[in-house]
Swiss-Prot record:
Species annotation: Homo sapiens
Lineage: Eukaryota, Metazoa, Chordata, Craniata, Vertebrata
UniProt-recorded name of the protein: Rhomboid-related protein 2
Entry annotated with the keyword Cell membrane: yes
Biased composition (Basic and acidic residues): 28-39
A single GO BP: proteolysis
């Protein structure tokens, strides 16, 4: 076992050494061709993103066609929309508790409310409303830090698919497992991105972890733990004048990411619609959605 481990470490070191050599050669070539500093910096950014987001076998393909067209429009747009809605409610009806909800937001047409489940848009629009400063900042930071590199690699359509799958999974799961609670925040979508990314990291652990860095990974895990802590607080330890908020979206979004998200993010250089894993994940997801719809119509305690 020790010999195998030594061989794996030696192979990893050789790969990293080869990549560094290729970087130096490419930068030298750009200088000779008059490519300029801007082009060299852009290429360096794409190389870093490829190491963090892709296994080694896919990095070359990405770097050959790497560009910022289209730019990461989806993640930036959804983040601006969430921030705009938060500012609107904070100014119109200032929140009395920075980590709970007030009556102004509880009456919002965006929030998921168990009494108004027939308004189907609420199963998606709840992602625009947040339960306080730390809630909006936590979600925005996580989805921008992870979502922008993901969208640079996989483009907006795929990232949007995973994000919205997590949002819908979050509200439907909450309607089943916590049927009498309100739901706000984009955590379902954020955790879907994280679930898909980290499944890809785990499957390609030996290739991606050295490039990504254990320290960065631990920071992200710490952020997740803190976010889950606040979610549990909002659910179980709210003040008397506050309203408990479900945290089921975090878990359901993570599972959506580990299924659909992993399949989407692991098919970087392949046709997604031709991958049987994608259709298996979609079929399982739709089965869960249909069950949730049936539950809400016929079995929910909120009826």
């Amino acid at each position: 076992m020790a010999a195998v481990h030594d061989l794996e470490m030696e192979s990893m070191n050789l790969n990293m050494g080869r990549e560094m050599k290729e970087e130096l050669e490419e930068e030298e070539k750009m200088r000779e061709d008059g490519g300029g500093k801007d082009r060299a910096k852009s290429k360096k950014v794409h190389r870093i993103v490829s190491k963090w987001m892709l296994p080694e076998k896919s990095r070359g393909t990405y770097l050959e066609r790497a560009n910022c067209f289209p730019p990461p429009v989806f993640i930036i747009s959804i983040s601006l929309a969430e921030l705009a809605v938060f500012i609107y409610y904070a100014v119109w009806k200032p929140q009395k508790q920075w980590i709970t909800l007030d009556t102004g937001i509880l009456e919002s047409p965006f929030i998921y409310s168990p009494e108004k489940r027939e308004e189907a848009w609420r199963f998606i629009s709840y992602m625009l409303v947040h339960a306080g400063v730390q809630h909006i900042l936590g979600n925005l930071c996580m989805q921008l830090v992870l979502g922008i590199p993901l969208e640079m690699v996989h483009k907006g359509l795929r990232v949007g698919l995973v994000y919205l799958a997590g949002v819908i999974a979050g509200s439907l799961a909450s309607s089943i497992f916590d049927p009498l609670r309100y739901l706000v925040g984009a955590s379902g979508g954020v955790y879907a991105l994280m679930g898909g990314y980290f499944m890809n990291v785990l499957v390609n652990f030996q290739e991606m972890i050295p490039a990504f860095g254990i320290f960065r990974l631990l920071i992200i895990i710490l952020i997740i733990v803190l976010d889950m802590g606040f979610a549990l607080y909002r659910r179980f330890f709210v003040p008397e004048d506050g309203s408990p908020v479900s945290f089921a979206a975090h878990i359901a979004g993570g599972f959506a990411g580990m299924s659909i998200g992993y399949t989407v993010f692991s098919c970087f250089d392949k046709a997604l619609l031709k991958d049987p894993r994608f259709w298996i994940a979609i079929a399982a997801y739709l089965a869960c959605v249909l069950f949730a719809v049936f539950f809400n119509i016929f079995l929910s305690p909120a009826n």
